[in-house]
Amino acid sequence: MGYIDRYLTDLETVIRDLSRADVEAVVDGLLLAWKENRQVFIIGNGGSAATASHMMNDLCKLTIVPGKRRLRAIALTDNVPLLTAWGNDASFTDLFVEPFRNLMRSGDVLVVI
């Protein structure tokens, strides 16, 4: 079996083994955020920060229904100067804490990748 066949077989296994209940819970949370006009924050560390940006792009662009309110999503990891300022001046352990104190409200949704 070649590389592509192994990759596709592995991908099929991962998709088949996904918890349908977990995926449904994420979708339900995002739908509720949209219905209640809540903010969705997406964060990740390292390569997952790029995934957070990509997810935010998909949520903001691919969910548009003409004439309907849009989903409000932001990848906090896209603001590198803010994160590194807090990391340098306070602690990299609490990198997201202070920005969330400024931005997050009760009922908002946090997606951590």
Where are these regions (language model features)?
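Hydrophobic packing residues in well-ordered alpha-helices of helical domains and bundles
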Residues: 4, 23-26, 52
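A short, well-structured juxtamembrane/interface segment
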Residues: 18-36
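C-terminal binding/interaction regions
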Residues: 104-113
